Amino acid sequence: MLLQVILEGLGLGALLVLVCAVGIRKGAVGMVHLYSPAVQQRCVKLGLTSPERIRRNSLLFKAVCIPGYIGYVLVCVYGINGAKGFVQGFWQLLVILSVMNLMDRLLVDGYWVGHTNAWTIPGTEDLKPYITAKDKQKKWLFGTVGMAVIAAVLAAMMTAFIH
């Protein structure tokens, strides 16, 4: 069961990578809502985007990703794996979300954003690294504590719903 749950986490991580790839398909400015305010302001100043477009893309990203990711993990844990009760649901949700978080931190942030030019926005190179050490600390903290909280909330909701 653990291997299956890890594979489901890899699947969620692959969905994240796919969403990012679609978001930057016409250039990284398409995902500038994920960058610091300084990078966003520079992109607006350079005429690459507008505050309204940044806001719209951010809302669209959240509207697609949050329900999509929640739906995916709930289908995996409760629909496919047949979890019953809080503990079974919680550990599976936590593993899936943690695997996705590791892929996000190491593959997306660490390698793709940090070591390739795919996420470079022309005219903002002087603002690199786009993900600072402080940003990384926050992401790691939220990724560990935050995913545990999300897993607990979803498991509690599903336990109440099922029983």
Predicted regions and their residues:
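Hydrophobic alpha-helical membrane-embedded segments
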Residues: 6-30, 96-112
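Core segments of transmembrane alpha-helices
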Residues: 58-78, 139-153
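Interfacial loop at the N-terminal end of multi-pass membrane proteins
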Residues: 15-58
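Juxtamembrane boundary at the C-terminal end of a transmembrane helix
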Residues: 154-163
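Juxtamembrane non-transmembrane "cap" segments at the membrane-aqueous interface
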Residues: 105-125
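Short membrane-interface loop/juxtamembrane segments of multi-pass integral membrane proteins
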Residues: 40-54, 120-139
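Interfacial segments of alpha-helical transmembrane regions
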Residues: 8, 82-99
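C-terminal halves and exits of single transmembrane alpha-helices
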Residues: 97-109, 131-150
